[in-house]
Every structure is written in C-alpha cells, then in structure tokens.
C-alpha cells in the first residue's frame, strides 16, 4: 500500500516556527555582506552599513528590500516565541529595523564631503537626522533580546553574544563618525546575526524537548 506523503499544509506548519524565521532573518540581516561583491564605493572599515541604503547609493533597493524582509521574518517569529522580554525586544527590533529603512540617509557622509557639509549646516532631511535614533533603538533592542536569550538558556555562547554587543556598542559611541567606526559596526551586525541563529537553535531545542502524549518528541503540537 502506498504511503501518503505529508500534505502541503503540514509542511507549511512545520516551517512556520520561530527557529525557521530567525534563520531566514539572520541571513537577510547579513545581506550587507554583498558589499564584498558589489562596487559600492564605500569603505568596509570607515563607512556605516546604513550608508549602503542611502538615497544616493546605486544598490540601495537591494539592501532596503533585504532589511524589510528580515524585519517581517522577525515579526513572524515573535508570534510563537516565549518570554516577555524576548518577544518585546524582537518586536521593537523589527519595528526599529523597518523605521531604519524608511528613514534612510540622504547621502553617504563617510565618502562625500558635500554630505558632511550638509550635515554640519543642518540641510539634511528629517529622516536623515532621525536615522541615528532608529539605529540606537535597533541596537538597544538587539542587546535586550540577547540578554533575554542568555537568561533563558544560561549558555556560554549567549553570554559571548551579549558581551560582544555591549563592547561594540561602547566602541561605536567612542568612534562615532571616526575611522574604524564601520568595521566595529560590521562586527556588531555579525554578532546580531549570530544571536539570531542561537535563538533559532534554542527554539528548536525547546520544541524537541516538548513531548505531547501520542506524538514523537520534536513534533509540532496541534494548535
């Protein structure tokens, strides 16, 4: 007798879980690595990653689309997460990422003298000025989510993520608009992506440890 394969609905239900969405979000949030293959004209060491999304940059829509999709994946992941601190932090992180994308920079000050002059005399747009606020919110919520993950898992790698985020946060404040600021931010973004992957791993482990009567361990319980 032929064995009936899993239905499309069942497959979608298995994919619709926080761990999967967090993995996709981590990949999308790391889309800035495409600058290694694209002629962006920005400095890997001195330019901020957000400058890739600036209004005058040729590949801005590639990076903006990736950030928006990544934020949507975080929103989808938050629906089935546990832990109030983690859920709130992920929601704020997603919202701040969307705001960061919508309130994009007018230009890339790290490589454009005219842009720096416009910033000095205050002739940039409101979105350009508010971008720093949304960036701080993004970092703060990512740090809070990492702290929540560390509190839930008590694992050493979660502690490393928190420590790296805190360290790069301090260095970013010290090196604001200075040489090396871009490199510090890129280390910070890689750390955030690592935190998302660790969150996915923790989610899979928690799901695997759940055993519903009559179902094998690791299966998705009925809603």
What do the PLM-derived regions correspond to, one by one?
Residues 8-206:
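Hydrophobic, aromatic-enriched alpha-helical segments typical of multi-pass transmembrane helices
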Residues 1-7, 209-223:
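Short, intrinsically disordered terminal tails adjacent to the first/last structured region
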